[in-house]
């Protein structure tokens, strides 16, 4: 039966048997008991599936990963301890010293740092391109050693909608996968695999948890990218892994090869696994994701329209606005809505922007987005503080930009708070 995604939010990933709990149980355990040392050996050889140590896998984590996988329409998925870990694993799983990445310049500041500084120090180079680049400019960014293309479905905080098909076509012409962070719209509003994206990541900390209570991340593989067709580019997947007695992931695990390698190698070596209690809580919160996203988007639409009509605001960026530069792309890829985050400009310089934030009462200042409580931030002074003026411009983050995450409160109360804060900085 083909069920609606709202139903998958509730029912996905877990089907209880007769007499079993209707809600997924929590397996808060580090290790698992076996009666046979031979069976344990098979687990370590990857010749048999099962659990032996939560640093690699845990039943609770896998249940929630399966739910997200179903929602995205993927072939395999895994959870990580944070969205940052998810993006790192997604790239490092196929990139090594001497390799190259093409990435959209309009991405979260922490991810920009990960790619531009940390991974560069590991010998992995990156060419950043504007999400608005022409096909010719995008083609020029590729090198013979390019292994992946990365972007965000809706960029944080500039709210630029990525043209999936343009980036996917370029990636596939060069025999590499397109990896997209789908945190902001969630699979409720956007299913990137339907438009040629190969791998999706999430900061589940955001809308999926939705209550500011659990840090986490997820990686979902569509199973559509043919690693063996480009075997020379991806030896980690297409040649024997010495650390697992010569297993070749692409031939042994098929559509699950990418996630199996990330679990067996990267989780083993980096240990970025979420605590089962965090996954369990997040899984419970995901049951209301469809309902919450509808409210987040409705609130953001109403607030964005109000801001757009207010002369005290210099500009508003929200893909749901008809006049927004990315409205047509949003209608194409996210016809049911975008997200609950708005960016807008408060004129007068950094001090004026900071003063506006300081005058807010209900809307809190927080390094967060996408939970039940409305919050705001000044990205140029916080999340993107490490970027140069030129890099800020490339990322679409001006010095007047305010990021507002609309919660699920009454939209009129959000507007009233913004109104009084704008009035205060005019005095």
Feature annotation, model-predicted:
Residues 1-58, 66:
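N-terminal "arm"/small-domain region of PLP-dependent enzymes with the aminotransferase-like
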Residues 6-15, 77-310:
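Conserved PLP-enzyme active-site core in the AAT-like
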Residues 36-88, 110-118:
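Conserved N-terminal alpha-helix of the aminotransferase class I/II PLP-enzyme fold
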Residues 48, 337-341, 399-403:
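Short, solvent-exposed beta-strand edge segments and adjacent coil->beta transition regions
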Residues 73, 145, 312-315, 362, ...:
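Glycine-centered tight turns that cap/initiate beta-strands
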Residues 116-117, 125-126, 140, 144-147, ...:
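PLP-dependent enzyme catalytic core of the Aspartate aminotransferase-like
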Residues 270-273, 277-279, 284-288, 293-295, ...:
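Conserved small-domain helix->loop->beta segment predominantly found in fold-type I
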């Amino acid at each position: 039966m083909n069920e609606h995604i709202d139903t998958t939010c509730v029912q996905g990933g877990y089907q209880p048997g007769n007499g079993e709990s209707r809600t997924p149980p929590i397996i808060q355990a580090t290790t698992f008991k076996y009666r046979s040392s031979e069976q344990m050996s098979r687990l370590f050889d990857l010749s048999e599936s099962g659990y032996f140590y939560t640093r690699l896998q845990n039943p609770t984590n896998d249940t929630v990963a399966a739910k997200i996988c179903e929602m995205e329409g993927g072939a395999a998925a895994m959870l990580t301890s944070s969205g940052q870990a998810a993006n790192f694993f997604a790239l490092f799983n196929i990139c090594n010293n001497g390799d190259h990445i093409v990435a959209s310049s309009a991405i979260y500041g922490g991810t920009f740092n990960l790619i531009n500084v940390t991974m560069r120090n590991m010998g992995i180079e990156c060419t950043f391109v504007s999400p608005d680049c022409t096909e010719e400019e995008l083609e020029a960014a590729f090198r013979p050693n390019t292994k992946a293309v990365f972007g965000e479905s809706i960029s944080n905080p500039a709210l630029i909608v990525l043209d999936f098909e343009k980036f996917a076509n370029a990636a596939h012409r060069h025999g590499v996968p397109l990896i997209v962070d789908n945190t902001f719209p969630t699979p409720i509003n956007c299913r990137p695999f339907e438009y040629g994206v190969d791998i999706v990541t999430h900061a589940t900390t955001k809308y999926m948890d939705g209550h500011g209570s659990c840090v986490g991340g997820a990686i979902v593989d569509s199973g559509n990218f043919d690693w063996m067709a480009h075997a020379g580019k991806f030896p980690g997947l297409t040649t024997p892994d010495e650390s697992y007695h010569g297993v070749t992931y692409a031939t042994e695990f098929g559509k699950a090869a990418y996630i199996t390698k990330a679990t067996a190698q990267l989780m083993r070596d980096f240990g970025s696994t979420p605590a089962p209690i965090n996954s369990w809580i997040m899984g419970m919160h995901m049951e209301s994701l469809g309902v919450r996203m509808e409210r987040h988007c409705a609130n953001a639409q109403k607030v964005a329209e109000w801001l757009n009509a207010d002369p005290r605001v210099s500009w508003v960026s929200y893909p749901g606005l008809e006049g927004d530069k990315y409205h047509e792309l949003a209608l194409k890829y996210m016809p049911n809505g975008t997200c609950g985050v708005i960016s807008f400009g408060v004129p007068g310089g950094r001090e004026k922007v900071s003063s506006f934030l300081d005058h807010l009462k209900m809307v809190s200042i927080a390094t967060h987005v996408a939970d039940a409580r409305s919050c705001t931030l000044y990205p140029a002074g916080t999340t993107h503080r490490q970027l140069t003026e030129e890099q800020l411009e490339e990322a679409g983050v001006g010095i007047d930009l305010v990021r507002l995450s609309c919660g699920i409160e009454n939209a009129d109360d959000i507007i009233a708070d913004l109104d009084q804060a704008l009035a205060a900085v005019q005095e």
